[in-house]
Amino acid sequence: MSCIAVEAVLLGILLYIPIVLSDDRAPIPSNSAQLNSWFDGIIQPVAVRKATMDPALVTAEGQTKVIKLKSDGSGDFKSINEAIKSIPDDNTKRVILSLAPGNYSEKVKIGMYKHYITFYGEDPNNMPILVFGGTAAEYGTVDSATLIVESNYFSAVNLKIVNSAPRPDGKRVGAQAAALRISGDKASFYNVKIYGFQDTLCDDKGKHFYKDCYIEGTVDFIFGSGKSIFLNTELHAVPGDQPAIITAQARKTDSEDTGYYFVNCRVTGGGAFLGRSWMPAAKVVFAYTEMVDAIHPEGWILVKPEHESTVRFSEYNNKGPGANMEKRAKFVKRLSDAEAKQSISLGSIEASKWLLPPRVVGLP
């Protein structure tokens, strides 16, 4: 057989071999009306995607355990903390805490070895509320959170997380109070509402995904070193005497693969800045986001003058009166179409390997 014939046969074989592409590289649509259909097409159930997902996650999703909890203590355990204690370290299966409506007045910490845990609110129209009033004065800032998650593959669906401590007045030392700290890798949040004032959400480290969420606060109310996408999420700056600051991303150098991406979100509330350069190479992107006129024209704040050449604050095709770029600070980058296409996708958090649709628990 000639070389040409061999090449033809090989080419024919290759044409019939199915090629699995990384579909999480598809750009997030600019039209919010298309988000759900786009998302459902890419992030399909684990049964369809076993070949491309983390093997340990596939195994965990194949052996699910459901724990039912009620706020009056009449569920399978008296409290969320008791239920968490029942889960062994190095857990290898998905454990779902199915939460009935009500107030769960607890400070909850999920240790770094308790993987594959889901908090699931049974009624999206009457969501369970996890509430506590810890402050930095008592616990330290990052440990003041009502919910602390240090393990991997955590997920929350239909949940309110509240830090009920009073608003800092600038006089009380240690008044900042977090509602949620997420320090584990590969975590997802669907229809989760997070309430606080200063330091509401510590998006600490790891890859995270937020969809259809609500986050409110005052100063630095989303902060940390995570690499996270916020999709169709409302960021509410609580009005007050001083302007709010939405983000304080903690990237120190360009070698760190971290950053916050807000895509198809909404910025509401009182006067606010989109972020400040808490660390020299802070990286934050806002794209396709609706911004009210309460956004200060400069948009962003430098903590130190030398940060001007090192921060990575970017905007792309935002809308609304607060999105006007005419008076934006000169260190803010307006992304090109090519740059936006490269960075505004689920591929930035390797979603094809771990991100799953929101869990729907069918209970008898």
Swiss-Prot record:
Q: What is this protein called?
A: Pectinesterase 1
**What are the record keywords, sorted?**
Allergen, Aspartyl esterase, Glycoprotein, Hydrolase, Secreted, Signal
User: What organism is listed for this UniProt entry?
Assistant: Olea europaea (Common olive)
What's any GO biological process attached to this entry? cell wall modification
List its EC numbers: 3.1.1.11
Cited InterPro entries? Pectin_lyas_fold (IPR012334), Pectin_lyase_fold/virulence (IPR011050), Pectinesterase_Asp_AS (IPR033131), Pectinesterase_cat (IPR000070)
Q: Cellular component terms, GO, for this chain's entry?
A: extracellular region
Q: Which residues, if any, are the signal sequence?
A: 1-22
Pfam families from the entry? Pectinesterase (PF01095)
Positions annotated as active site in the UniProt record: D220
Q: Which EC class, in a word? A: hydrolase
